[in-house]
Amino acid sequence: MPSSGDAAGRRPHVVLIPSAGMGHLVPFGRLAVALSSGHGCDVSLVTVLPTVSTAESKHLDALFDAFPAVRRLDFELAPFDASEFPGADPFFLRFEAMRRSAPLLGPLLTGAGASALATDIALTSVVIPVAKEQGLPCHILFTASAAMLSLCAYFPTYLDANAGGGGGVGDVDIPGVYRIPKASIPQALHDPNHLFTRQFVANGRSLTSAAGILVNTFDALEPEAVAALQQGKVASGFPPVFAVGPLLPASNQAKDPQANYMEWLDAQPARSVVYVSFGSRKAISREQLRELAAGLEGSGHRFLWVVKSTVVDRDDAAELGELLDEGFLERVEKRGLVTKAWVDQEEVLKHESVALFVSHCGWNSVTEAAASGVPVLALPRFGDQRVNSGVVARAGLGVWADTWSWEGEAGVIGAEEISEKVKAAMADEALRMKAASLAEAAAKAVAGGGSSHRCLAEFARLCQGGTCRTN
C-alpha cells in the first residue's frame, strides 16, 4: 500500500477521481503521469466500469498498460435508476450516478492510504464532504478553460443577485475577467431545472471549500482569467489556483498498428492539410455533416476528417456512405481522408502537413492546438464550447464566426460559409505566426522553471508537506 506523504519526506499518495467522458479522463490521465513521473508522487486513478463509451475504456487500458506506476482503483457505483431523468444525456446521467455513489468512496480511500485527493468539477460538491470525513485535502482538477472556471465560480452569485427577476440568464459579467454573452452560456444553464444546471450550481458553490484548484491552461493563453482567479477577484474566499497546462500527452502509449492516417499525412505537402474533428462528446446532425462535407470540398484544400454521428460511440453503426452525400468520398479521394476511426489527435496536430484545425473547441482540443501551434477555425456545438471559442479568438489562436448556430438553435452553417472561412484561415499568415508564438509560450510554461511547471511542483509540495487546507 502506498504511504501517505508527510513532512518527513515520504512520497505523498494523490488519489485522482475523474468523472465520465474523454474530455475529463484525458487530462486526469495526463496529470497522473506528470505527478508520478516528474513530481515525486504516488498516484492512483479511480475508475468506474463499465465506461459510458468504448473510447474511455480503451484510453484507460492503454494508460495503465503504459504507466504501471499509476495505480488503478476500481469503484463500483450504487444502483441508479436513470428513468428518473428521461431523455437525459448519457454522460450527465453518469455524472449523477457517480455523485450519488460518492459516500461509498470513504472505504476505498481509507484502504488506499491516500494523503490528498484531486477530483473533477462534476463531483466537487459530493467528494469534498467525503474528503473532510477522511481528513484529506481535496483539490479540484478543472478540465475546461480558466474562463469557464470563472463562470462556474461566479454563476451562483449571478443567480442570487438576479433571483426573482424572471428574465432568465443573460450576459454574465465576471469580475476581473470579461463578459460572457448570453449566447455563449452553455445551453443547459438557461433551464434552472435541468440536471446539469443543478449539478453546475452545486459544484460552483462548493469551490470555495476546495483545498485548491488546478486548471489545464497557461498564462499566455488566458491572462485575464488566470490572473483574476489567482487574485481572488472572481469569488471571495477562493482557494489557490494552479495553472498547470497544457497537460501534455503521455509519450509512450501504444499506437494503433492498423491506423493509416499517419501514412496519409506523410504523403501530403507541408502546411497543406485541414484537420477536422469535433471530439468524442457530441454528434453532428446529418444535415450539418453534409454542409461541412460540401464546404471542405469547395475549399479546394486537402483534409483529414474524423466523423462522429452519435453521442456514444458504441451506438455508432452508420457507414460513411450513409452519412455523406452520394459520390462525395469518390470525388475527394485524392485530397481527402475521411474516417470514423479513432486518431491520436496530438500526433496529428504535431505533423508538419497540418495547417488548420476545424474544431468544436472542446478544451482538450484547444490546449493541444495551442501546444502544437496549429491555428483553429472554431465551430462550437455544445456546452462550454462557445466560451472556449471566445478564448481562442481573444488569444489569437484562431477565428470564430460567433453568429454561426449551434445545438438548439435554428439553421445549419452553410457549405459556402464554411468554405470561405477555411480558405481565409489557410491564407492568414499572421494567424499562423500567432499560433506559433503560443506554442512557444506553452513549451516555456511546462518546461522546468516555467509557470505551469512551478504550479504543479507547488501542488506536489503542498501535498507532501500536508499543508493543504481541508475546510
Curated annotation (Swiss-Prot):
UDP-glucose-dependent glucosyltransferase catalyzing the c-glucosylation of 2-hydroxyflavanones. Acts preferentially on the dibenzoylmethane tautomers formed in equilibrium with 2-hydroxyflavanones. No activity with naringenin or naringenin chalcone. Belongs to the UDP-glycosyltransferase family. Gene3D superfamilies: Glycogen Phosphorylase B (3.40.50.2000). Residues 280-281 are annotated as: UDP. The lineage of its organism: Eukaryota, Viridiplantae, Streptophyta, Embryophyta, Tracheophyta. Its EC number is 2.4.1.360. This is UDP-glycosyltransferase CGT. The active site is at residues 24, 120. An anthocyanidin binds at residues 24, 383. One of its GO terms (molecular function) is UDP-glucosyltransferase activity. InterPro entries: UDP-glycosyltransf_plant, UDP_glucos_trans, UDP_glycos_trans_CS. It is an enzyme of class 2 (transferase). It catalyses: a 3'-hydro-2'-hydroxy-beta-oxodihydrochalcone + UDP-alpha-D-glucose = a 3'-(beta-D-glucopyranosyl)-2'-hydroxy-beta-oxodihydrochalcone + UDP + H(+). The keyword Transport does not apply. The keyword Oxidoreductase does not apply. Keywords: Glycosyltransferase, Transferase. UDP-alpha-D-glucose binds at residues 143, 343, 345, 360, 363-365, 368, 384-385.
